[in-house]
Amino acid sequence: MDPKLLDILACPLTKGPLVLSEDKSELISKQAGLAYPIRDGIPVMLESEARALNVDERLDK
């Protein structure tokens, strides 16, 4: 994922920052507690496509 794109993307629910997951397959919104998938290099920024973070993921800094 292009770092410039990551700088301008925000969570569609909270408008907060997103963090690229360690395996680079998801964009994580800690505020919303959601992980948005990245498919074929394109972030899918739909709440209906996001998965809820588990407790450990929400607390992981």
UniProtKB/Swiss-Prot annotation:
GO cellular component: cytosol
Pfam families documented for this protein: Trm112p
Top-level lineage group: Bacteria
Gene3D superfamilies hit by this protein: 2.20.25.10
Signal peptide: none
InterPro entries named among the record's database cross-references: Trm112-like (IPR005651)
Family: Belongs to the UPF0434 family.
PANTHER family in the record: PROTEIN PREY, MITOCHONDRIAL, ZGC:162634
Protein name from the UniProt record: UPF0434 protein PSPA7_2181
